[in-house]
Each structure stands twice: as structure tokens, then as C-alpha cells.
Design a protein with these regions (language model features):
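Electrostatic, structured charged patches in enzyme active sites and in nucleic-acid/phosphate-binding
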Residues: 1-227
Length: 227
């Protein structure tokens, strides 16, 4: 797909809105790395999310799993005048004439905001240009009182990521169709305490362990539980 101009994106309201009404500045179909892009559905808001890499997909799932986070805005555009000013003050070449973006701008339940930048590994810090752009991004947020966090894909807990991906398709009760999906629903809605970080979930064993909880859920949701 042909890249869209900044003017056109602004006209479409890209980078505006919150929660289910947020419109990311960049959409997955607009980048060349389509093989690693993904469009998961936010199980809490129903919005289609625009993620540009496998690392972004992993980090987004982990952030979304955190109930202290109430909003995640991906591909968030930075104010062009501010970034040009930062570039000028520190003698850094601005990356093009279009807005820079932050991978994720997160809003916490307590009102705190955190900006996340994701990189593949610490090896990228050996590249001077990458460090310059990260410095600009960090300066942009810190000067506005927003915490900035740099995350490396190599540090992401893939067990947690895969476990989250396993259960969240059953977040809504109407998606439940058998005992295995009941367990996944109960985990996704955090009605049963499960260690998600240490080992892959074994649904067969969990069905045995939480047999009473499954029966109780079916009893309370008899209109949905037709299996």
C-alpha cells in the first residue's frame, strides 16, 4: 500500500482519540514488514490494534494483561514542532519531515502516563543514529512529565506472552464452547489465580484441578453453556 502523507493522516484523525476510539498514526498495512505485522483485537475494548512487529505484539499483550493499565495507544505521533526544537537544541538531525512516533503510550489507572519504546536487543545501542533518535524520544516525553521506558524484545517473557494469547480469545463468555474454553475464560477474566509466567499452561490438567469452578460457571451461565 502506498504511504499516506502526514496531511492526509491528520485529516483522518490519526493519533487522536482514546481507548476504543483511538486511531493509530501508522497502520500495519502501510509498512513493508507485513510478515511480522499483526492486528489483534483488544479483548477489553474490541478495537483492532495496529502492531508492526512480533516484539510489539508480545509487549502489547503483556501490557494489556495488566489491569492497572486503562489505555494503550500504539504508534503514537509526537508533536513535530517539539521534536524539531529538541533536534535543534542538541544538534541532532531530525529523522525526516514527518512526525516521529512512540510505540506505546500507556495510561495507568492512577492517571500516570508511560511512553514505551521497543527495540530488538541492546545491540541497537551500538548504532549512534539509533541512540540519537531514542534520546530525542526520551527527551520529548520526560520534558512533559511522562515516564519513558526502553524495552528490548530479548527481555520479554515469552511464556507469559504465549499464555496470554492462549486465553484471551475466550475473554467474553459467548466465546466459550467447551470445558477447555471455560478454563481459558476464567483465566482471562482472572477469576482463578494462575501462574502465567513460569511455564506454559496445561489446560488438560487445569480442567481437572478446577472441575468445581467449571461446573459452577456452567450452572451460572446455563443459557450460554449448551455443551
Amino acid at each position: 500500500m502506498k504511504k499516506m502523507s502526514d496531511k492526509r493522516k491528520r485529516q483522518e484523525g490519526r493519533g487522536t482519540g482514546t481507548e476504543k476510539d483511538y486511531k493509530p498514526y501508522i497502520q500495519a498495512r502501510e509498512v513493508n514488514s507485513l510478515g511480522t505485522c499483526s492486528n489483534p483485537i483488544d479483548w477489553k475494548t474490541g478495537r483492532t490494534v495496529q502492531l508492526l512487529s512480533q516484539g510489539e505484539d508480545a509487549l502489547w499483550h503483556i501490557l494489556r494483561w495488566n489491569d492497572d493499565i486503562i489505555d494503550i495507544r500504539e504508534q503514537y505521533p509526537l508533536d513535530l514542532k517539539r521534536t524539531f526544537k529538541i533536534a535543534g537544541e542538541y544538534g541532532i538531525q531530525h529523522p525526516g519531515t514527518n512526525p516521529m512516533t512512540t510505540d506505546f503510550l500507556v495510561t495507568m489507572r492512577n492517571g500516570q502516563m508511560i511512553a514505551y519504546s521497543l527495540k530488538p536487543s541492546k545491540a541497537v545501542l551500538e548504532d549512534k543514529r539509533t541512540v540519537e533518535k531514542l534520546f530525542m524520544e526520551k527527551t520529548y516525553w520526560v520534558t512533559q512529565g511522562v515516564e519513558f521506558k526502553l524495552i528490548f524484545k530479548t527481555d520479554i517473557n515469552t511464556i507469559l506472552y504465549n499464555n496470554i494469547r492462549l486465553v484471551v480469545p475466550y475473554y467474553k463468555a459467548e466465546k466459550v464452547h467447551d470445558d477447555a474454553s471455560v478454563i481459558k475464560h476464567l483465566i482471562a477474566t482472572k477469576r482463578i489465580p494462575i501462574d502465567m509466567e513460569s511455564a506454559p499452561l496445561k489446560v488438560r490438567l487445569l480442567k481437572q484441578e478446577y472441575e468445581k469452578e467449571i461446573a459452577l460457571w456452567r450452572q451460572r451461565n446455563s443459557k450460554l453453556a449448551t455443551f
